[in-house]
Amino acid sequence: MPRPAVFLDRDGVLNQEVGYIHRLEDLQLIPGVAQAVRRLNDAGWFCCLASNQSGPARDYYSIDHVHALHHRLQELLAASAGAVLDAVYFCPDLSRPEGGVVADYAGWTTWRKPNTGMLVAAAWDHDLDLSRSVMVGDKATDIDLARNAGCYGILVQTGFGDRVLEGSYQHASQPDYIAEDLAAAVEWICTHLAPR
């Protein structure tokens, strides 16, 4: 039977929002994030990273660098609280009008948020029920992705979340819940939704 998942954006949700991360050591967890992910692990949720990462398309760094950043993220989560991301999905693509310059990644794709490609692929790969799943992010595109995929959408106020709420970043979105940070989002998830 398909199970639900918690999909997590990366920058501004799990790690500090510092723009494009060129050095591995600049990827730093937001305080309390590892414990929040561990709580989801312990409660039986499938935890999956779902993140737009256009650095390779913009020619800022290689796809291998993105993989190294995700390896560091997993190491920090494990070292801090024994937390685990069960799967990692990301979109390195960006269309040319949006700034994509590297031919291999400069195009439109169903994987780039708010399109549903990453979540549909994860659902297929891991037998997930999107209608009972949650997308947690700090941008309007995360909430739009949740709507497009039929998931619950939680906007965290870390990263760009406050600017989304003010209407000064992207467009107004209507999340199912607004949380101060990932720990508060996980509290809401564990109180209102069941992982099975």
UniProtKB/Swiss-Prot annotation:
Mg(2+) binds at residues 9, 11, 138-139. Substrate binds at residues 9-11, 17-20, 51-54, 112-113, 139. The record marks 112 as: Contributes to substrate recognition. Its EC number is 3.1.3.-. One of its GO terms (cellular component) is cytoplasm. The record marks 51, 113 as: Stabilizes the phosphoryl group. PANTHER family: D-GLYCERO-BETA-D-MANNO-HEPTOSE-1,7-BISPHOSPHATE 7-PHOSPHATASE (PTHR42891:SF1). This is D-glycero-D-manno-heptose-1,7-bisphosphate 7-phosphatase. It comes from Thermosynechococcus vestitus (strain NIES-2133 / IAM M-273 / BP-1). The gene is gmhB.
